[in-house]
């Protein structure tokens, strides 16, 4: 045995390629015990003894099977290079093993580790336990002897033979009886398996859970220092041994279900195998499975003995609990009569017919139960007292829900149906193990979670659709996708073994026998060959065992070299591995671990979420980022029930506020829940559940998020990252700045998941809406003839969206307009978003109607036929239904404006540039005096109906101590009062409900005299957007001061949807008039903007109108006899319909829509996805995005936290999205700020930057882009200069100071210094975006060679004098960019 290993020798051993010297060996190599025959697992003579075989088949062939698209595309030389890399490093490993070939640990039952210690358990209970009669019990002593005599033992036994539950207990009892120390760990692939087995053992043995036996799954640990048998998930054990670089904490390591071949499983086997041969030689390893490829695993764990590789010992557990009969579709001809279509390997699917076969089988089981109970005849009116349970294997939640619905409709069959899926709650999982009500049959609908992790003992029947969903990595994009595929024979055999635990079992495979034989694969493709390797490579780097490819070449199924290369590049892109300053020195197979990489390797979250946490620490928003990372790592705690999806969506939008970010909605909801708990409002479980239901939040999941949040806080504390307990000094702008910084941090963490939106065609959109306001209106199609008859049905369909103001019927189209609060800022109404969301959710909009011919036949002898497709306006505010003239809305001259120059008094400021007022010329003043006098002469009566928003009435207002009534519109009702808007003046007031009065009809005829104004050609500056809700508090205060205290002169530019777009002038003493827009722009609150297409059209029309004599203009208000006739016929029809003279509606009309032509479509910025179709998941706030400012051509940016692709790779699905503020140049700024490498584009004269190419850069050796798929090419739409690039570099350097290794790194800084660096980073970030003078707008110029690197003359590149950490050696998060010199 080894006398002594020094630290240096151990480190040398861990680094593949280094030789270990000066090792003293003692003792002779032991012989294997006589009771361990090895004939069945000996290697064939063809396998070289010095190279351990990883798998039965060629690893490169396995890779080809896993990735057919890439494998068939590879050249022969590329494939041979894959073989070379595996063979090279395996031979290296074999040579190093030769040093220790004679140094095997002595065998024998009395062996103990040198670190063995006496248990500190005060009293281990004497075992008088009688083991259940399972197959493994018959060979108990033999198995214990084998485990004690061998380093590695493989246990192969049928499902239900007792491997997982009994064997670890045998070892525990064996050591307990001898008063010897042991510490046994058993891995399970799933949490539910580890916890349920530990619970079962503790219950069987009457032990306290967490005492002698315990478990650890994820964040949940039920174990103490006295625990001697612990069950844990594969990942938990892997994290433990990677951190310790040793197995010596345990005496026995049981690895269960090794056939599953997950990435974690294969890496665990690799590390265990490595450690067994180095510093953990006394630990016993036991591999267990029912469907294991024994030779493959035995060869993999072979050890050199006397110049020969001896495979690990394989023990076969003979016998099965009970026989299991299996059947295929061929055997079920008596159930289905119509021929089922043949299955195809490339098209895994479940047809409706196959579902029906499964349902028929479940009904047939009563016959089987009766026959087995001895009752030969069964009438169907009775059931056996104990009906055996049925386990149905389905590929996913959607299929489970469909089958659940089929079975729950069979009420008379007395079935208790339970879903079993990773997303169901713990309580629902526990229901699976409960005995059913007597006389009822338990049906479990499960994914492959019940394949191995969960054993339900009373299952007699298994129905297997032979399908599964596997996580695969798309060849082109590297994005993950859950794909439906055929399960392997190994998995199906595991499923079969779930039956027959207590009696004879039956397994029904719903495929044909010949398809099983010829098409179903034998084994599952290992995850290491089909999934991203990021977390595995980081753990390899943490182990410091040399290049990742060197270690991974010794895996059971080595990943392809190209996959390792790609993983290294993706880790460099995220910043976990350093990007070399010298691109030609870049190692495609390795990289230096950065501070970020070390953090990521310790966190149980994805690389992007780990980066989010680190960037949150840098910019002082760590708490928010921890919440987001915890929430996105687990199942979404927002719930959107099937029939309440719109309500759930509305609730999520409410939590997001105006941020339009799913991530920020998570933060706000989590903090709202936390605040309620801290206030004691959720002290009782029922109160908490009620709060969750009210807010569409799943309480169990938000609690899990809280646990992970605390766990992440604890883990990052080792890196000197702490949430600041001090409350920040709050100023008016702080919450808005914090929100913006968090949005930027999200963009940094999720680079390069960047998307923009296509621009709507304004001209076409105006036509589609017939000139109506897109912010308040949606379009419906397929309106039936005489559609106006059904306006109440239509109104009720949209009631869940918002208050409908009017509906205009125009032929087969209808325009539904929602009420807008006149005192809220211009934006697309939430009601419009919800209406479009209804269309996206395919909510059925169905009307009960009369056939057109029936209406014409029953009313006035068919004279109403002229109304079949006439234009009709239903105004719910005025409660009128009137025919409409042909109108172009914005092109009509409004009757309320007699001149383009007006003098106004401002009565209500909504926000900067948006206000209400009224004309103060003599003519208008006289009109208002007469109106007020007429109102107050009348005998006013109380409202005949309950007040509601949008109702026009009369309300009191006191002016100069005199109370008078004025026309008003109710904005909202709260308790016994209402807020009203005075429609002739533009101001608002709170009024008691009992003071409101009904408005006489004649007072509604005069148009409302208050005017709504919007300053034209102006938009908020970046500073205003960042420091406020669209406009900053400072901007609002400055504007209010400019427009108050004196009359204003306004010059009308255009009239759009009854809003006057104007230039506003203020006279100040004897000075000239001051243009308020110019003042706001000069002071940095605003910037110039383009007017919309509608506004420009209106401007041209108004110029024409006022160029002519007003007297010659036609009066559009004059009613024509034809319209009077139409109105009379409409009233007749409405009365006939209301009085039911037409009879009951006998037809249905399904409407199409609703639509809004300004809805935006998303496009990816990365090269590989630029032309792929992009969908945003329906649960996202941004699944509906409607343009508020179509005239603004600057790109709007969207960031996605995660992406996946469909099975064909043609469509991308975005999840957890955030819509960034509409700041000109934002996509370019964020891309340059967070890209690993960038190359600036210049115009032909070299005088200005025209764009940028972002990515991992260019390799001058290979003369090719390093990661071309993720390159982002952008053309600038604002002007950037050298100073901007310098500012970006300064900010990147500021980030590095809080995200780097070394003696001056953040791990060694005090809290005050960290706070200073954080504030410095925040201020530099805000300074980059908030400029007094906005960046000049330019016309985008696309580079003539898009996506091509190395296009800049090297003589013009400004090399950075000092790169942090030195050239090519830096482990900082971001390298500094190289600016390009511009010509004067």
From Swiss-Prot:
InterPro entries: DEAD/DEAH_box_helicase_dom, Helicase-assoc_dom, Helicase_ATP-bd, Helicase_C-like, P-loop_NTPase, SNase_OB-fold_sf, Tudor, Tudor_TDRD9. Residues 379-546 form the Helicase C-terminal domain. A motif (DEAH box) lies at residues 256-259. Residues 36-46 have a biased composition (Basic and acidic residues). ATP binds at residues 157-164. Transmembrane segments: none annotated. The keyword Hydrolase applies. Residues 946-1006 form the Tudor domain. Residues 35-60 are annotated as: Disordered. It catalyses: ATP + H2O = ADP + phosphate + H(+). One of its GO terms (cellular component) is piP-body. Residues 144-310 form the Helicase ATP-binding domain. Its EC number is 3.6.4.13. GO terms for biological process: cell differentiation; fertilization; male meiosis I; male meiotic nuclear division; piRNA processing; spermatogenesis; transposable element silencing; transposable element silencing by piRNA-mediated DNA methylation. It is found in: Cytoplasm; Nucleus. GO terms for molecular function: ATP binding; ATP hydrolysis activity; helicase activity; RNA binding; RNA helicase activity. Interacts with piRNA-associated proteins PIWIL1 and PIWIL4. ATP-binding RNA helicase which plays a central role during spermatogenesis by repressing transposable elements and preventing their mobilization, which is essential for the germline integrity. Acts via the piRNA metabolic process, which mediates the repression of transposable elements during meiosis by forming complexes composed of piRNAs and Piwi proteins and governs the methylation and subsequent repression of transposons. Belongs to the DEAD box helicase family. DEAH subfamily. This is ATP-dependent RNA helicase TDRD9.
């Amino acid at each position: 045995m080894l006398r002594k290993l020094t630290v240096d020798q151990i480190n040398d051993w861990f680094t593949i390629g280094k030789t270990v010297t000066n090792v003293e060996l003692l003792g002779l190599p032991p012989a294997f015990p006589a009771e361990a025959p090895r004939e069945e697992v000996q290697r064939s003579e063809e396998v070289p003894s010095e190279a351990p075989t990883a798998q039965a088949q060629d690893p490169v062939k396995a890779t080809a099977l896993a990735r057919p698209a890439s494998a068939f595309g590879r050249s022969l030389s590329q494939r041979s290079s894959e073989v070379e890399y595996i063979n090279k490093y395996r031979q290296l490993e074999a040579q190093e093993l030769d040093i220790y070939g004679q140094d095997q640990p002595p065998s024998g039952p009395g062996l103990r580790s040198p670190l063995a210690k006496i248990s500190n358990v005060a009293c281990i209970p004497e075992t008088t336990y009688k083991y259940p009669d399972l197959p493994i019990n018959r060979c108990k002593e033999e198995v214990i002897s084998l485990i004690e005599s061998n380093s590695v033992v493989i246990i192969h036994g049928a499902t239900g033979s007792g491997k997982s539950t009994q064997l670890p207990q045998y070892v525990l009892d064996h050591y307990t009886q001898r008063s010897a120390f042991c510490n046994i760990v058993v891995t399970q692939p799933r949490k539910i398996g580890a916890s349920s087995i530990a619970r079962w053992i503790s219950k069987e043995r009457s032990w306290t859970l967490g005492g002698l036996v315990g478990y650890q799954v994820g964040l949940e640990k039920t174990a103490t220092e006295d625990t001697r048998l612990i069950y844990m998930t594969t990942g938990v054990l892997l994290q433990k041994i990677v951190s310790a670089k040793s197995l010596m904490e345990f005496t026995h390591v049981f690895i269960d279900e090794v056939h599953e071949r997950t990435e974690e499983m294969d890496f665990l086997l690799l590390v265990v195998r490595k450690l067994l041969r180095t510093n953990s030689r006394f630990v016993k390893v036991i591999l267990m499975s029912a469907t294991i490829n024994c030779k493959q695993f035995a060869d993999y764990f072979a050890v050199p003995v006397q110049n020969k590789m001896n495979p690990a010992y394989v023990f076969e557990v003979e016998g099965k609990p009970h026989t299991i009969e299996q059947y295929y579709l061929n055997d079920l001809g008596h159930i289905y009569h119509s021929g089922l279509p043949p299955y195809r390997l490339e098209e895994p699917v479940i047809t409706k017919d196959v579902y029906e076969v499964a349902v028929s089988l479940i009904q047939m089981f009563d016959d089987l139960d009766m026959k087995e109970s001895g009752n030969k005849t069964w009438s169907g009116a009775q059931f056996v007292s104990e009906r055996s349970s049925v386990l149905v294997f389905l590929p996913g939640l959607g299929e489970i829900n469909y089958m659940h619905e089929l079975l729950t409709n069979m009420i008379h069959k007395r079935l208790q149906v339970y879903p079993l899926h990773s997303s169901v709650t713990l309580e629902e999982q526990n229901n699976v193990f409960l005995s059913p009500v007597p006389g009822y049959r338990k049906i479990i609908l499960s994914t492959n979670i019940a394949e191995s992790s969960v054993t339900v003992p009373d299952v007699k029947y298994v129905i297997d659709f032979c399908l599964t969903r596997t996580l695969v990595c798309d060849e082109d994009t590297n994005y993950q996708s859950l794909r439906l595929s055929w399960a392997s024979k190994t998995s199906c055999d595991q499923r079969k073994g779930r039956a027959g635990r207590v009696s004879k079992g039956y397994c029904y495979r719903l495929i044909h026998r010949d398809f099983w034989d010829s098409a179903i694969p034998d084994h599952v493709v290992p995850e290491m060959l089909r999934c991203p390797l990021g977390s595995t490579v980081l753990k390899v780097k943490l182990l410091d065992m040399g290049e990742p490819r060197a270690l991974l070449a010794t895996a059971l199924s080595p990943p392809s070299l190209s996959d390792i290369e790609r993983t290294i590049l993706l880790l460099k892109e995220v910043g976990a591995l350093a990007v070399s300053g010298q691109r030609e020195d870049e190692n495609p197979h390795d990289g230096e671990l950065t501070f970020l990489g070390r953090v990521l390797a310790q966190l149980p979250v994805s690389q992007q979420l780990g980066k989010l946490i680190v960037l949150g620490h840098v910019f002082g928003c760590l708490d928010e980022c921890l919440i987001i990372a915890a929430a996105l790592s687990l199942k979404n705690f927002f719930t959107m029930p099937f029939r309440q999806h719109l309500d759930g969506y509305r609730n999520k939008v409410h939590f997001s506020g105006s941020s339009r970010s799913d991530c920020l909605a998570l933060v706000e909801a989590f903090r709202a829940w936390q605040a309620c708990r801290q206030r004691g409002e959720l002290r009782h479980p029922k109160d908490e559940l009620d709060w969750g239901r009210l807010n569409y939040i799943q309480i169990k999941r938000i609690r899990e998020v809280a646990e992970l949040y605390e766990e992440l806080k604890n883990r990052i504390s080792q890196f000197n990252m702490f949430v600041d307990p001090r409350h920040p000094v709050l100023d008016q702008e702080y919450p808005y700045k914090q929100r913006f910084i968090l949005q930027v941090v999200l963009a940094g963490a999720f680079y390069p998941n960047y998307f923009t939106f296509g621009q709507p065609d304004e001209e076409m959109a105006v036509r589609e809406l017939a000139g109506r306001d897109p912010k308040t209106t949606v379009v419906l199609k397929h309106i039936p003839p005489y559609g106006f008859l059904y306006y109440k049905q239509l109104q009720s369909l949209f009631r869940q969206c918002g208050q409908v103001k009017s509906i205009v019927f125009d032929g087969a189209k209808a325009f539904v307009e929602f009420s807008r609060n006149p005192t809220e800022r211009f934006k697309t109404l939430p009601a419009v978003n919800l209406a479009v969301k209804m269309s996206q959710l395919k909510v059925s909009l169905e009307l009960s109607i009369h056939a057109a011919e029936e209406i014409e036949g029953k009313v006035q002898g068919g004279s109403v036929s002229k109304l079949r497709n006439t234009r009709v306006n239903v105004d719910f505010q005025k409660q009128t239904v009137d025919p409409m003239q042909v109108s172009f809305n914005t092109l009509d001259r409004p009757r309320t404006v007699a001149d383009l120059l007006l003098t106004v008094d401002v009565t209500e400021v909504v926000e900067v540039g948006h206000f209400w007022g009224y004309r103060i010329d003599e003519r208008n003043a006289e009109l208002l005096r007469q109106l007020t006098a007429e109102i107050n002469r009348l005998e006013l009566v109380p409202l005949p109906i309950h007040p509601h928003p949008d109702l026009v009435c009369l309300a009191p207002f006191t002016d100069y101590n005199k109370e008078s009534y004025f026309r008003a519109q109710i904005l909202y009702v709260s308790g016994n009062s209402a807020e009203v808007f005075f429609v002739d003046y533009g101001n608002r007031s709170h009024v008691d409900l009992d003071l409101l009065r009904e408005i006489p009809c004649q007072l509604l005829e005069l148009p409302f005299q208050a005017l709504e104004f919007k300053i034209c050609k102006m938009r908020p500056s970046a500073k205003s957007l960042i420091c406020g809700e669209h406009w900053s508090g400072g901007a609002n205060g400055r504007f209010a001061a400019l427009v108050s205290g004196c009359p204003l002169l306004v010059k009308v530019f255009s009239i759009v949807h009854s809003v006057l777009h104007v230039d506003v002038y203020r006279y100040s003493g004897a000075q000239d008039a001051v243009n308020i827009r110019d003042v706001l722009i000069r002071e940095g609150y605003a910037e110039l903007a383009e007017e919309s297409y509608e506004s420009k059209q209106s401007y041209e029309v108004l110029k024409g109108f006022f160029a002519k004599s007003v007297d010659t203009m036609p009066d559009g208000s004059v009613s024509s006899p034809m319209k009077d006739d139409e109105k009379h016929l409409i009233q007749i029809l409405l009365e006939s319909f209301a009085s039911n003279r037409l009879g009951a509606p006998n037809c249905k009309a399904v409407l199409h829509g609703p639509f809004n032509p300004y809805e935006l479509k998303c496009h990816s910025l990365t090269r590989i996805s630029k032309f792929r179709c992009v969908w945003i998941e329906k649960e996202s706030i941004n699944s509906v995005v409607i343009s508020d400012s179509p005239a603004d051509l600057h790109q709007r940016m969207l960031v996605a936290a995660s992406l996946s692709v469909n099975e064909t790779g043609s469509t991308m699905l975005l999840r957890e999205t955030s819509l960034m503020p509409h700041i000109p140049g934002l996509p370019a700024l964020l891309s340059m700020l967070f890209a690993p490498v960038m190359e600036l584009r210049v115009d032909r004269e070299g005088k200005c930057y025209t764009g940028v190419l972002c990515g991992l850069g260019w390799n001058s050796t290979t003369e090719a882009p390093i990661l071309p798929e993720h390159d982002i090419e952008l053309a600038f739409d604002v002007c950037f200069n050298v100073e901007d690039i310098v500012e970006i570099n300064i900010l990147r350097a500021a980030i590095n100071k809080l995200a780097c290794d070394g003696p001056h790194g953040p791990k060694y800084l005090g809290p005050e210094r960290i706070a200073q660096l954080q504030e410095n980073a925040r201020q530099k970030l805000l300074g980059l975006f908030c400029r007094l003078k906005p960046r000049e707008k330019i016309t985008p110029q696309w580079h003539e060679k898009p996506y091509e690197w190395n296009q800049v003359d090297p003589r013009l590149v400004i090399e950075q004098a000092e790169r942090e950490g030195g050239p090519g050696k830096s482990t900082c998060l971001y390298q500094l960019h190289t600016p390009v010199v511009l010509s004067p």
